[in-house]
């Protein structure tokens, strides 16, 4: 809740009239630039029993008496230090303002605190603005009024005319949220499981800020690092940030398994909020780790932020999305021109194209239970570095950042030729998989078998034997013929 004015009060007395009394129920207070869906409530502190004056209202005589229920406000200085700004005459009961007191904003806040503590009834029914524009309180008895707004914005009053106009000078706060993507901040990014994800939330404040509480909710795929929170303040018109001391706020970590929908809250102390000017920016940075519960694909992993302020008001929710992807692989061979699953092929996945096992960085994995497909999750502490295909020839590697990957066959099935070079796979920021310039899903890897070579003792050798025998026999016939001729 916030008091609707810098001075916090307004007197409704006659502007043109030179005299009047409390029974004149024709006072009007109009709030200009009222904010849509904000509620305005008016309380009367003093009755103006009568007045008389000349041309200048400040030179007139005014007889104020205390409204019922406000006596403790003037006397309980420990709870309401500015209550003694009003001086009540013991004999007559009339009230005057101590002219040496000028902290009107503090007085208004104490008066509002008293209203809540004592459940003081409003002077008129509260009004909620249906649109940005004006709201009015009409038919008001003459008196000294306090106006309260749920918007958390202060307005100034510098008139005691019978028809009083209040300017709603300030808007409501706003929240912007981004996530680090490379060297920039955007509303979305991509990451591998195990990567740190850095967030930045900016609250653009307004004067009269009250009850600022930042609420942050992370999906189950993000593990919040509660030591990572840093809060800075950048004053309006400036370009440098300064740290906000941790005495100015409290952080509450919420158990995600509970029914509370938030991951953490940051509640800003009112003393800090009181220092904020229009368009000052509170900049909060923090991080989380993408974990094994991460949603795979374009649905992504959400981080939502909103600010509650004033009396149960809240900003629009600001959201970022962190996506992580998968590479589905199908190992096959062609039999009768049909793709046939091939088992016992072994692969590694890396972020570099080096083929020497001792030098390239293999992505570590952990096995995940699948249905018809073997599934593996990225895990920097995982013990799986090679995947061997089963009877389906299929497997998936999940939890991958966008980027370029190299799938290397380290062992081929018996009787098949091993791939001589890695398969280059590119994952886009939207999860599209490209191989050799073509979008694919899954990544298909074919193995071929070579034709069989002739073996020793086969038909070819037999032919040599036959020809050899024929030659030997032929030689024998020649020798016999020659002997007979002799």
Which residues make up each language-model segment?
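Solvent-exposed loop/turn and edge beta-strand elements of beta-rich ligand-binding domains
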Residues: 1-486
């Amino acid at each position: 809740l916030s008091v609707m004015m810098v001075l916090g009060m307004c007197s409704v007395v006659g502007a043109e009239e030179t005299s009047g009394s409390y029974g004149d129920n024709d006072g009007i207070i109009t709030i200009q630039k009222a904010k849509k869906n904000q509620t305005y409530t008016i309380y009367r502190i003093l009755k103006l029993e009568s007045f008389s004056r000349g041309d200048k209202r400040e030179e007139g005589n005014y007889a104020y008496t205390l409204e019922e229920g406000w006596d403790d406000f003037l006397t309980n200085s420990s709870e309401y230090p500015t209550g003694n700004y009003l001086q009540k005459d013991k004999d007559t009961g009339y009230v005057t303002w101590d002219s040496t007191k000028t902290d009107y904003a503090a007085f208004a806040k104490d008066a509002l605190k008293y209203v809540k503590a004592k459940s003081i009834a409003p002077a008129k029914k509260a009004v909620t603005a249906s649109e940005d524009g004006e709201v009015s309180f009409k038919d008001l008895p003459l008196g000294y009024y306090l106006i309260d707004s749920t918007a958390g914005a202060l307005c100034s009053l510098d008139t005691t005319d019978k028809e009083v106009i209040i300017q709603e000078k300030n808007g409501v706060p706003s929240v912007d949220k981004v996530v680090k993507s490379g060297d920039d901040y955007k509303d979305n990014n991509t990451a591998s499981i195990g990567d740190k994800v850095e967030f930045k939330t900016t609250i653009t404040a307004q004067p009269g800020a009250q009850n600022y509480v930042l609420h942050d909710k992370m999906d189950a795929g993000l593990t919040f690092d509660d030591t990572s929170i840093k809060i800075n303040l950048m004053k309006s018109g400036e370009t440098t940030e300064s740290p906000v001391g941790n005495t100015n706020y409290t952080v509450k970590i919420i158990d995600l398994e509970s029914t509370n929908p938030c991951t953490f809250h940051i509640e800003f102390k009112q003393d800090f909020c009181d220092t904020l000017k229009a368009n000052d920016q509170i900049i909060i940075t923090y991080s989380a780790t993408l974990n094994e519960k991460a949603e795979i694909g374009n649905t992504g992993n959400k981080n939502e932020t909103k600010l509650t302020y004033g009396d149960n008001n809240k900003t629009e929710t600001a959201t970022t999305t962190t996506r992580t992807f998968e590479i589905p692989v199908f190992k096959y061979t062609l039999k009768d021109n049909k793709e046939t699953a091939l088992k016992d092929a072994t692969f590694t996945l890396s972020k570099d194209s080096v083929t020497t096992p001792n030098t390239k960085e293999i992505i570590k994995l952990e096995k995940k239970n699948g249905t018809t497909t073997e599934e593996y999750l990225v895990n920097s502490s995982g013990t799986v570095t090679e995947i061997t295909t089963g009877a389906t020839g299929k497997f998936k590697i999940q939890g991958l950042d966008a980027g370029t990957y190299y799938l290397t066959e380290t062992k081929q099935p018996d009787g098949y030729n091993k791939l001589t070079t890695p398969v280059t796979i590119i994952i886009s920021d939207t999860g599209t998989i490209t191989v050799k310039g073509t979008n694919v899903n899954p990544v298909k890897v074919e193995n071929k078998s070579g034709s069989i070579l002739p073996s020793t003792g086969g038909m070819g050798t037999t032919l040599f034997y036959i020809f050899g025998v024929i030659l030997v026999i032929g030689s024998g016939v020649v020798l016999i013929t020659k002997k007979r001729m002799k």
